[in-house]
């Protein structure tokens, strides 16, 4: 296995591991509702270190994994690299406690947000924006196979819709906010894992 293969598989593994960790962690957290609370809320509380590490380690793995695509498309490499770095930033700058999590936190949003929370929001916007952008780039990358390009086109559309639905659910404090986010992550990160694995 060469260096390109190794970094590609590292990135693919990181994308899958990220989903696995937040899924298991969310199922086993007291007071945490996966269908309602966002993934980022797992970085709060006594076990918050686990999701912080998940953001940072998996973000780093994906950023490194993007290098497997450098001979395929520099734009695609940059897009996925930025995604990975934004994921790292999401772990460094955590969201504020809100909406009944961690347990004992009042329902709803706080009267004001910390600078750390604002930086987390900015990083999250980059994370969710770069997936459909990268998928769109992949759609028009002739070095990729036709099936992968079609798959990428579908992902670009689906993740865009999912991101908008999640954003609307968040603004409305919907009981299904976490569900929309998780579905969007599952679709987008799975595509990313497939892309990096194929490129390895």
Which residues fall in each region the model found?
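Hydrophobic, aromatic-enriched alpha-helical segments typical of multi-pass transmembrane helices
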Residues: 2-38, 42-200
């Amino acid at each position: 296995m060469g260096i390109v293969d190794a970094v590609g598989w590292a990135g693919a593994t990181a994308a899958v591991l990220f989903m696995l960790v937040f899924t298991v962690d969310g199922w086993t957290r007291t007071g945490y509702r996966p269908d309602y609370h966002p993934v980022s809320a797992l970085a709060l509380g006594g076990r918050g270190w686990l999701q912080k590490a998940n953001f940072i380690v998996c973000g780093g793995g994906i950023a490194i994994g993007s290098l497997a695509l450098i001979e395929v498309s520099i734009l695609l490499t940059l897009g996925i690299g930025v995604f990975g770095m934004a994921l790292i930033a999401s772990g460094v700058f955590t969201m504020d406690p809100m909406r009944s999590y961690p347990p004992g936190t009042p329902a709803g949003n706080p009267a004001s947000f910390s600078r750390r929370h604002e930086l987390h929001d900015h990083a999250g916007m980059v994370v969710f924006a770069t997936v459909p952008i990268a998928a769109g780039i992949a759609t028009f990358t002739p070095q990729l196979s036709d099936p992968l390009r079609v798959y990428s086109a579908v992902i670009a559309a689906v993740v865009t819709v999912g991101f908008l639905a999640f954003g609307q659910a968040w603004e409305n404090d919907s009981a299904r906010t976490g569900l929309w986010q998780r579905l969007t992550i599952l679709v987008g990160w799975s595509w990313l894992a497939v892309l990096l694995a194929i490129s390895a």
